[in-house]
Amino acid sequence: MKVAKIPYLNAAPFYEGWGDDPPFETVSMAPRDLGVAAGNGTIDAGLMAVADWFREDASFELIEPELGVAASEHVRSVILFSNENPGRLDGRRVAVTRESSTSRRLAQLLAVAYWKADIEWIPEDELRGDPAEEVDGFLLIGDRALELMADEVHGGWARETDLATEWWSWQALPFVFAVWAVRSGLPRRERARFGGYLSGSLALGSERLESIAAEHAGTLGDAETLEAYLRHFTYRLGPDELAGMRRFRDLLAEHDIQEYQDARA
């Protein structure tokens, strides 16, 4: 069994019980790459960006118990950096991190349906210099977003817009960024065993948030700030989180949100 993990601080509590020799093969991937691997059939389970799971749900099912990465009101690591508020980015160019899968779709959805801004989305790979000089905004996620938030000048940007805050203001529901999913074709016993193993590892990680934060303190922020960051996440998905996930899926369909490359055509 090959399991993909996301190498971000917000996912670290899931891995606390894995040790150096977990009972499965592991690979570390950014969210977008993990989604590609799931589609190609090269992984059996992973912490999958929820937008990718929407695409792959015929082949992957949520593990039991349902686990993921969700937040209410704010997240601090899915940030649109800009010099204007989002509603004033109409006709402007905004770069999107190469790592993102769910957050770039959330940004597109917010732009179309909430901010009412026609934004030109630019893949990060097209940037050649300082983003603050080339584009009007930059969407970052995960540890890169945390690092820029911890920087005194925020990379030269004047404004930071937390996409979880925008979603909460609009829909008053938690936002689920990623879910643990396992290939449906695996034997039922193997799927159940993995779900139990992961749940137990998370239980251990949840008891060690202070030490996890201390281990990562530095460029991402101080230990106290990072512990508060970790404690804000919901990792065991309940009815509100699942409702938020369904609402996101429905809104993506309603507004015909596609890959940002397609949206530029």
PLM feature spans:
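Bilobed "Venus flytrap"/periplasmic-binding protein-like clamshell domains
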Residues: 1-20, 29, 75-136, 143-144, ...
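Beta->alpha turn/N-cap motifs
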Residues: 9-10, 30-32, 42-54, 59, ...
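Short catalytic helix/loop segments, enriched in acidic residues and glycine
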Residues: 22-34
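Hydrophobic residues within well-ordered alpha-helices
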Residues: 38-39, 131-132, 252
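Hydrophobic/proline-rich hinge and linker segments of small-molecule sensing/allosteric domains
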Residues: 67-86, 169-185
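Pocket-lining segment of extracytoplasmic ligand-binding domains
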Residues: 122-212
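Secondary-structure end/capping motifs
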Residues: 186-251, 255
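Conserved C-terminal helix/tail region of periplasmic/extracytoplasmic solute-binding proteins
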Residues: 256-265
